[in-house]
Amino acid sequence: MSEDDTSRQGWTALVLAGARPGDPLAAAEGLAAKHFAEIGGASLIARVLGAIDQTPWIDRVIVAADAATPPEALEGLTSKPLSVVGTADGAPATALAVLNSEAGAPPLVVTTSDNALLTPAILKHFIAAAHDENIDLAVGLADSRTIRSRYPDVQRTYLKFRGGTYSGCNLFAAKTPEAGRVFAFWKQAEALRKSPVKLARLFGVRALFLYVAGLLTLDQAFALASRKLAVKARPILIPYAEAAIDVDKPSDLELARRIAAGKA
């Protein structure tokens, strides 16, 4: 298939852009929301929308935002049809609400407004892989070796499995309504994302044992999750280190600025 195969068109992009009260980056930059911080003269959210705008398989865009991001702040940031909706109680609940709406009907690719190093190449790789799989949901991950080979000093939270360690990329592809079960579970698991052992416990004693013993592979983890949630979920490895570098704190912003300027 060619890179611009029309069979892959028809996607909607959801950008999760809710502001977190007391966000340290927003406070440090004196902004209403951290995604208004700039890299190379463009805000984080403008960079995300710009990458989406240059991805031909995405037809329309939904931004889920709160009062910190009025619709007029997004004017001119994409040439694709754009709608702005409110946020629910956290990112997982927001993603679920949008997926269940008419506007957010699958296929839906989900990312965040702080995913400032997102590029059309990353999106194309992810969407192409998700499109070609018979699945309900795809989750973008980057191998730690991919990240450290480019940016050896970068600090990320890694999930350790037999055969590799991986970082999330704030990229999800919902291909069917059944993906909503994962978003509902994500809401429950979100508080545990920095504690892989507690997260594994949610999937049962066997998953916990295998994880703690270092015997659980990435594919096994997704197979266990798929059975528990009655969905077909798959990981998609993204060969771009930048996909795993979101902007959560001032040091992340500095790193992203260096990367964008070609100085990292």
Locate predicted features.
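Short phosphate-binding loop-to-helix
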Residues: 75-108, 117-118, 124-125
